[in-house]
């Protein structure tokens, strides 16, 4: 935000201000930052398990606030927010904000639901997620219901709709195919081991991509496409990626590549004066 303000103050144009690298995160009212959630129990990307062609230990699904699935949960995490941000022009609302992750006893007993490799529970240890999830259950961060109907009532959802959704999901698991959303067959694990649990999810995490527009020399441009003398930018403050973030660590690569380009051109510019 500071970089954007400073650039605008000297006449910079802005681009990609509506772009964000975001996934589904849990945000709780009594904690200042959002949490990445380890849905599968094998890391947020689940790649280690799928690469070894192992069946998932526990099942989970994402539903909107009406209890309906709307995408494959094996999502591209940095683009998931675009799915969540779908706007219903008839009801004039965002039906997927918030969303809910629904899972059962298998996942709660498989270890920490909060991701511990990054985020508040990561290396900085802003929060220590309990090993058995008991502290988070006690705080109401994880909602519990002995039945799906009970869980639905606790999260202000129509019980019959959530029950239908889980019934359909379990049928997909039985057949080994998810024809509507094409979930990986290795992730088709039934939700049939009560009690059931839910975590409220919002689009968030990672980073925004907007900022001062720059050219191939890393020069910051004004609204007329002209370079502002002696002003350069690199990295996520005006990222070149725009709508879609390419991969984990791509932001670091952009800082390194355009930082070098900016430095070379800044030295060249200074030498010409």
Residue ranges and their predicted role:
Residues 55-57, 206-208, 248:
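Short, small/polar residue-rich loop motifs at catalytic or cofactor-binding pockets
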Residues 10-19, 69-71, 160-163, 273:
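Acidic/polar loop patches that form or flank catalytic/metal-binding clefts of enzymes
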Residues 90-196, 265, 269:
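Helix-rich C-terminal "cap"/substrate-channel and partner-interaction subdomain
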Residues 68-113, 117, 227-236, 240-243, ...:
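Gly/Pro-rich active-site capping loops and adjacent beta-alpha segments
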Residues 161-245:
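A glycine-rich dinucleotide-binding beta-alpha-beta segment and adjacent secondary-structure elements
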Residues 65-66, 216, 223, 257:
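Short, ordered coil/turn segments that flank beta-strands lining enzyme active or ligand-binding pockets
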Residues 36-86:
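Phosphate/diphosphate-binding loops
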Residues 1-32, 88, 252, 258-261, ...:
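Glycine-rich loop(s) and the adjacent beta-strand/alpha-helix scaffold that form part
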């Amino acid at each position: 935000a500071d970089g954007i303000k400073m650039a605008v103050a000297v006449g910079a144009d802005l681009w990609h201000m509506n772009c964000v690298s975001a996934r589904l995160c849990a945000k709780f009212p009594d904690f200042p930052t959002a949490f990445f959630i380890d849905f599968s129990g094998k890391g947020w990307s689940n790649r280690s398990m799928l690469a070894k062609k192992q069946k998932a230990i526990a099942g989970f699904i994402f539903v909107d606030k009406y209890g309906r699935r709307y995408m494959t949960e094996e999502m591209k995490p940095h683009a998931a927010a675009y799915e969540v941000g779908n706007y219903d022009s008839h009801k004039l609302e965002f039906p997927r904000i918030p969303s809910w992750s629904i899972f059962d006893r298998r996942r709660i007993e498989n270890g920490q639901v909060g991701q511990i490799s990054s985020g508040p529970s990561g290396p900085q240890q802003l929060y220590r997620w309990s090993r058995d999830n008991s502290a988070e259950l006690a705080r109401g961060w994880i909602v519990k219901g002995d039945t799906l109907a009970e869980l639905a009532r606790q999260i202000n959802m129509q019980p019959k709709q959530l029950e239908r959704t889980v019934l359909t999901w379990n049928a997909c698991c039985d057949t080994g195919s998810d024809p509507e959303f094409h979930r990986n067959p290795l992730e088709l694990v039934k939700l049939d081991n009560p009690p059931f649990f839910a975590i409220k999810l919002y689009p968030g995490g990672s980073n925004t991509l907007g900022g001062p527009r720059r050219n191939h020399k890393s020069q910051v441009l004004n609204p007329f496409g002209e370079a502002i003398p002696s002003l350069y930018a690199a990295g996520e403050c005006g990222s070149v990626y725009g709508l879609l973030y390419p991969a984990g660590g791509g932001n670091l690569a952009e800082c390194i590549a355009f930082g070098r380009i900016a430095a070379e051109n800044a030295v060249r510019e200074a030498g010409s004066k």
